[in-house]
């Protein structure tokens, strides 16, 4: 699909519900002691996998994704393997849950997910007492023999909300306390939600301490996804004639790293929290920012914006001076090798960019000429290069653009709403 340059970009929009929070709301409601009501869940390929696995384990769901009632039941061993699709969150979080049930399960995924590392969850969960068998001890398919677990103190090798969440979810049914210590802070939805549900959780910096507990069902409205909003917010800053407002979006401080970096770069941007519902929710406003300055992204912000880091390269094209991202090797272990895909495709569009093992450097100001790109089936890269097309000279042809359905099924629909061509 060819995305042509836009004359003007303007509008007020709300983005789809938060994917990370939807996964966790579904899982926690299935683990609760009584029924829950969930509002505004994101329905996409990834979250459907979590829903379907929980259903196969015995959880009963009623209603639709705008209002869903969840009736938990004790999990029963499934007869067939459980399909995780392309969803790393489903795989890693459900590994933690399933490790704590004395039954046998098998998780498998598509070819992209089957290349993503799982040793990082296998290791701590085996220390707690579960048994795993995986391809090369690291990749899906993966068999889990759950057990009665013991709490552990575990230092994660990388800052990863998925690994932290897997261990904490396993710890809910373990004997004794579970402690997770990260090298840097990662998004905190799991511990924040558990704490709000009355589970004894203490957070001190990068250390999370959890005591085993049960909790009652709950009511929750899922806010808009800041990672989806990010594409529109960046577009608003780099387009020469733009004003965009995003409403009802999640503003959890462990997710606003991109907004912080944009402020450092001098973007015309502001955000405010308007309500709290297990998570802070609010509004982001952005307009054309002609005086962007290059920046070295601070290391402590990298895990708080891992999904948004490639967008920093797009900002860097239109910023004066050097924009540098380092300590982001984790980007190579996403749905695609996002560093390689970013660099190769930017070069196709006439942008000069330098690749590092753990990041990239771009020197602005430059322009995006146009051309064809291949996001390699990665939803976030397809959206990034679609935004690039709107600020290019000749337009950008995005191969396999349908892959955006993984997280943002109505992305192009919303884009059409704000673009004046």
From Swiss-Prot:
Family matches, as HAMAP family: EPSP_synth
Associated pathway: Metabolic intermediate biosynthesis; chorismate biosynthesis; chorismate from D-erythrose 4-phosphate and phosphoenolpyruvate: step 6/7
EC top class named in words: transferase
Source species of the chain: Thermotoga neapolitana (strain ATCC 49049 / DSM 4359 / NBRC 107923 / NS-E)
This protein's encoding gene: aroA
InterPro entries, A to Z: Enolpyruvate_Tfrase_dom, Enolpyruvate_Tfrase_sf, EPSP_synthase, EPSP_synthase_CS, RNA3'P_cycl/enolpyr_Trfase_a/b
Protein name in the entry: 3-phosphoshikimate 1-carboxyvinyltransferase
Subunit structure: Monomer.
One of the protein's GO biological processes: chorismate biosynthetic process
Disulfide bonds: none
Active site: 307
Positions bound to phosphoenolpyruvate: 19, 88, 116, 162, 338, 380
